[in-house]
Amino acid sequence: MTKSYSESGLMGEPQPQGPPSWTDECLSSQDEEHEADKKEDELEAMNAEEDSLRNGGEEEEEDEDLEEEEEEEEEEEDQKPKRRGPKKKKMTKARLERFKLRRMKANARERNRMHGLNAALDNLRKVVPCYSKTQKLSKIETLRLAKNYIWALSEILRSGKSPDLVSFVQTLCKGLSQPTTNLVAGCLQLNPRTFLPEQNPDMPPHLPTASASFPVHPYSYQSPGLPSPPYGTMDSSHVFHVKPPPHAYSAALEPFFESPLTDCTSPSFDGPLSPPLSINGNFSFKHEPSAEFEKNYAFTMHYPAATLAGPQSHGSIFSSGAAAPRCEIPIDNIMSFDSHSHHERVMSAQLNAIFHD
């Protein structure tokens, strides 16, 4: 009889080992691959760390370099301002010539403009009521006087009445300097102290002004509708020949004469004038007597200038007593000669009173 497998004792006895099977080979190969992959990963990680360290150092160096460059640029900007706009081109000969030509044209335009302005101001100085052969008004004074003159004329046209000379001059001299005011007053034959009392606080208040002592009469000029002399249409030297009517001072001179004064008929303009005389600030002009007047009124007696100074000079004239000749001056003839000014008439009245005493 045959033995069974269990009985043969195979279960208890070790079996001899045979050659490795294909599964073992597969497992061993997989383990090797895993180990190789791990090594490669470790190498890659080490290389990556080394690369990162290297790159980090380079980046830090680059950052430091950039910071240093920025600091240097900021320092340069602080030292030198940054120029804006187009860069300066190189100056060539052609550009220099064009530049000089443009500059010459601009200078010529400015010169012509100033010449035209000065010519217009000269024409304006001839029109405004202020004339002087020795003094020239400044530009600002000329413009101010012209503005006041236009304002005064517009007020006259608006009111339609003949203006008062004092108020007219006050309007003209508003805002002007004292020298210009004196020139305007001299051209209109007025004393600036009479119509500008507020500028002279030392002037006594009891002294009357020109408008209070002598009635102001408007002058009659050839130009109709204008209250001031026609400075633009007439020669400036003729302005000073204009005289007020003789009856303007008759009320003030009547106490010096025995009979009332009569009006004198004479032309509005007289002959040539001698240089002006200044009496108490008033501008008056001495007329040169003609040859006929010298023949008709030739005085044979010559009196010293001190005879008009005071009463102590009277003895030198009348020292001979009753034997001295009495000289009477024909007042009517003198008053009929209209070339005498106000102060000359007063002097003749005083002489007549002395001779009649």
Curated annotation (Swiss-Prot):
Acidic residues biased stretches: 58-78
Residues covered by the bHLH domain: 101-153
Effect of S274A: Strongly reduces phosphorylation. Reduces transactivation on the insulin promoter in glucose-stimulated insulinoma cells
GO MF term set: chromatin binding; DNA binding; DNA-binding transcription activator activity, RNA polymerase II-specific; E-box binding; protein heterodimerization activity; RNA polymerase II cis-regulatory region sequence-specific DNA binding; RNA polymerase II-specific DNA-binding transcription factor binding; sequence-specific DNA binding
Modified residues (Phosphoserine): S162, S259, S266, S274, S336
Tissue spec: Expressed in pancreatic beta cells, pulmonary neuroendocrine cells and retinal interneurons amacrine cells (at protein level). Expressed in endocrine cells of the pancreas. Expressed in the inner layer of cerebellar external granular layer (EGL). Expressed in the Ammon's horn (AH), which includes the CA1-CA3 pyramidal layer and in granule cells of the dentate gyrus (DG). Expressed in photoreceptors of the outer nuclear layer (ONL), in a subset of cells in the lower half of the inner nuclear layer (INL), and in a subset of cells in the ganglion cell layer (GCL) of the retina.
Keyword check for Transcription: yes
UniProt keyword terms in alphabetical order: Activator, Cytoplasm, Developmental protein, Differentiation, DNA-binding, Neurogenesis, Nucleus, Phosphoprotein, Transcription, Transcription regulation
Source species, domain of life: Eukaryota
Positions of the UniProt region annotated as Disordered: 1-94
Oligomer and partners: Efficient DNA-binding requires dimerization with another bHLH protein. Heterodimer with TCF3/E47; the heterodimer is inhibited in presence of ID2, but not NR0B2, to E-box element. Interacts with EP300; the interaction is inhibited by NR0B2. Interacts with RREB1. Interacts with ATOH8.
PANTHER family documented for this protein: BASIC HELIX-LOOP-HELIX PROTEIN NEUROGENIN-RELATED, NEUROGENIC DIFFERENTIATION FACTOR 1
Name of the protein: Neurogenic differentiation factor 1
Organism: Mus musculus (Mouse)
